[in-house]
Regions:
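Conserved short strand/loop->alpha-helix "switch" segment adjacent to the catalytic nucleotide/phosphoryl-transfer site
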Residues: 44-56, 60, 88, 127-176
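Conserved phosphoacceptor histidine of two-component systems
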Residues: 53-68, 72, 76
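Short acidic helix/loop segment immediately C-terminal to the autophosphorylated histidine
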Residues: 74-86
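Short beta-to-alpha transition helix within the HATPase_c
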Residues: 91-102, 111-128
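Short beta-strand/loop element within the Bergerat-fold HATPase_c
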Residues: 174-187
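Acidic ATP/Mg2+-coordinating residue in the GHKL
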Residues: 195
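Glycine-rich nucleotide-binding loop
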Residues: 199, 232-238
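ATP phosphate-binding glycine-rich loop and adjacent ATP-lid/helix-beta elements
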Residues: 202-230
């Protein structure tokens, strides 16, 4: 299919990172920018580094707002759903989209400030599960996650913490959930989520489905991570990955 002349191309990457470029019709790409006096596009003038940075920041802000809106819509639909399973699935979707929206606010040119993302999400996780008597502690070393991995890591963290809060503090028992993200001596990073709940048999088929391990293992493979789970005096999930 031939390329249109002077076409405006927008592509959203796998991690919600928005890149927009202009094609000049001769095979060369030039950074897009607006007219000084209006909102149109001008191909005759290059943008300065400061203008590019401001545009990128604006795009991140708009993407975050869009994801938060989708999260709110999913949550509203879950409240109107008649079937409990439908409500559960829509709530899960709302939580996942909301987490990605929060992640967008911490993207920089160098990567995603994952510690700042976790700091923002911690009170949200506590509030979502306020009916459970859970003590949630999150610690994270200063880590910049690349765009190619940040969204996947955010979804894994969201899933593991959600599971720990639901199952580790089941039957209205008080519980403790510890989350830790840091670097290992070999240069790799690890994410550890542990609870002091009743535990379970990870080899049991019903347990794999119940805890959504299929989802976490699938995402772990996307970041070439090594995921492991132990159940002794609670459950400890560990993901070792490279950045």
């Amino acid at each position: 299919m031939p390329r249109p002349q002077n076409g405006f191309f927008c592509a959203i990457g796998a991690n919600s990172w928005l890149f927009c470029r202009l094609h000049d019709g001769r095979g060369a790409e030039k950074p897009f920018h607006r007219h000084r006096g209006g909102g149109g596009l001008d191909m005759g003038e290059e943008r300065t580094d400061g203008e590019v940075a401001r545009t990128a920041s604006e795009l991140r802000h708009r993407m975050a707002n869009t994801l938060q809106l989708l999260s709110a819509l999913s949550r509203m639909r879950s409240q109107r759903a008649a079937e409990p399973e439908t409500r559960r699935q829509l709530t899960w979707m709302a939580d996942a989209i909301g987490s990605l929206g929060a992640l967008e606010r911490h993207r920089t040119e160098q990567g995603v400030n994952f510690a700042a993302y976790l700091q923002e999400m911690t009170p949200i996780w506590r509030r979502r599960h306020s009916s459970r008597q859970a003590e949630l502690t999150v610690t994270c070393e200063p880590i910049l996650a690349p765009d190619t991995a940040a969204s996947t890591l955010a979804l894994i963290t969201q899933e593991l913490i959600g599971n720990a809060l639901v199952y580790g503090c089941a039957d209205d028992r008080p519980g403790r959930i510890d989350v830790r993200v840091g670097r290992l001596e070999d240069g790799r990073c690890e994410l550890v989520v542990s609870d002091d709940g009743p535990g379970f048999d990870p080899s049991a088929p019903e347990a794999r489905e119940r805890f959504g391990l299929w989802f976490v293992r699938s995402l772990s493979a996307q970041v070439r991570g090594e995921f492991s789970l132990t159940s002794t005096q609670g459950v400890t999930c560990r993901l070792v990955f490279s950045l």
